[in-house]
Structure formats: structure tokens, C-alpha cells
Amino acid sequence: DIVLTQSPASLAVSLGQRATISCRASKSVSAFGYSYMHWYQQKPGQPPKLLIYLASNLESGVPARFSGSGSGTDFTLNIHPVEEEDAVTYYCQHSRELPPTFGGGTKLEIK
């Protein structure tokens, strides 16, 4: 299985500043011109919500302050400017092969 390692596990950012979350895969999740890495946001008591698909594509309805980048094994989620409602947990997930796996999560806090 492909292991996804997220960092940091928790992050405190001031309102209006930038939050950067990293995800490293144990092997490449890129193939055929695509990077099969996705980012989710999970609020307490709710299922994960897709934010970014195929590394850098913004899901419909997601604010443009969210962006994704990366290829191969290293990926980044950026949130800028951070808003109060963004203080939840974020996960990366790959779909390069079965089974799809998730990173361990990053909890974003506002300071």
C-alpha cells in the first residue's frame, strides 16, 4: 500500500495568513500525465468534503483561497487567506492504486 505522510500534524495560523500543509507519498502517485492526489476537509461530525482533486483542481463550490500543487511524491495544500471557518482537519488521499489511502490528517487552528 502507498503510505501518505502529512505534516505538520497540527498548525496554528493567524487570520488572514497562509496555511501550508504537506503530504508525501511512499511512492509516486503520478501517471499518464495526472497526479492522483486529492485533498479533503473534515468538520466534526461530518464526512470529509473534497476540496482539491488531481493535485491542483478546485472542486466546484470550494473557495479560491484553497489551492493545491505538487507531483510525484510531494504535494502541498495552501489556504490563503485563512478564515475562521477553516479551523478544522485536512487530509490528503491518493487514488493511484488500490487500496486508496489517506494521510494522518492536519488540524488547523486559528491563533
Swiss-Prot record:
Superkingdom of the source species: Eukaryota
Residue segments, region Framework-3: 61-92
Gene3D superfamilies assigned: Immunoglobulins
Cystine pairs: 23-92
Region of interest (Framework-2), residue spans: 39-53
Residue segments, region Framework-1: 1-23
Name the record gives this protein: Ig kappa chain V-III region PC 7940
Annotated organism of origin: Mus musculus (Mouse)
